[in-house]
């Protein structure tokens, strides 16, 4: 008998034990996602990127992604642009894998974070705002209610998501001692800049 999957991730999960919260955790980086049906905390650090914490509050299944839209020189996101199609692909990956773990499509709830104006030297004005606008528009289009949001501002955020309860804790990082956050997002942005769109990903049913 095949055991049901307990989690899905884009890459090998970066696992660690969080001493403060006294629990197992997975840290995701720009371009990654993680979905689980276990009591695993999901953690990420956001600058201009956005993260969606998606979960089924009854079945206690959830996941988080971390992405931004590639630069296609469009001021506002539009679902037909190449960059928006990349965002759609990032969202559909997360939704599909939460559903594969057993979550119900019509029970999903979302909490969204990030979109800060923290990157320097970008040709697109306020990329964080574009990312935030895209993710809110997408969730509205998919009829997934946004239960909580902490978007925009000028500070990076560290996000802690507890999928079994839907609880999210956010810490604004107002003092930055190095350029790690900006370097990771800049490298990720350059990596996806010339990628073809993700293509069509069929969503599972209710």
From Swiss-Prot:
GO terms for biological process: chemotaxis. Keywords: Chemotaxis, Hydrolase. Pfam families: CheD. SUPFAM superfamilies: CNF1/YfiH-like putative cysteine hydrolases (SSF64438). It catalyses: L-glutaminyl-[protein] + H2O = L-glutamyl-[protein] + NH4(+). InterPro entries: CheD-like_sf, Chemorcpt_Glu_NH3ase_CheD, Cytotoxic_necrot_fac-like_cat. Its EC number is 3.5.1.44. GO terms for molecular function: protein-glutamine glutaminase activity. Belongs to the CheD family. Probably deamidates glutamine residues to glutamate on methyl-accepting chemotaxis receptors (MCPs), playing an important role in chemotaxis. This is Probable chemoreceptor glutamine deamidase CheD 1. It comes from Shewanella oneidensis (strain ATCC 700550 / JCM 31522 / CIP 106686 / LMG 19005 / NCIMB 14063 / MR-1).
């Amino acid at each position: 008998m095949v055991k049901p999957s307990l989690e899905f991730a884009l890459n090998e999960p970066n696992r660690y034990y969080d001493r403060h919260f006294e629990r197992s955790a997975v840290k995701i980086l720009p371009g990654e996602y993680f979905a689980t049906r276990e009591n695993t905390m999901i953690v990420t650090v956001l600058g201009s990127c956005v993260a969606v914490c998606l979960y089924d509050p009854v079945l206690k299944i959830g996941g988080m992604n971390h992405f931004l839209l590639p630069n296609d020189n469009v001021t506002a996101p539009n679902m037909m642009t190449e960059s928006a199609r990349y965002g759609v692909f990032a969202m559909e990956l997360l939704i599909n894998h939460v559903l594969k773990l057993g979550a119900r499509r019509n029970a999903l709830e979302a909490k969204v974070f990030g979109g800060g104006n923290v990157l320097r030297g970008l040709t697109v004005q306020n990329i964080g705002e574009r990312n935030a606008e895209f993710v809110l528009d997408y969730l509205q289009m998919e009829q997934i209610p946004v239960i909580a949001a902490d978007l925009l501002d000028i500070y990076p955020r560290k996000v802690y998501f507890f999928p079994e309860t839907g609880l999210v804790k956010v810490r604004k990082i107002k003092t930055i001692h190095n350029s790690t956050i900006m370097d990771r997002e800049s490298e990720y942005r350059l990596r996806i800049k010339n990628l073809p769109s993700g293509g069509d990903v069929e969503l599972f049913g209710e």
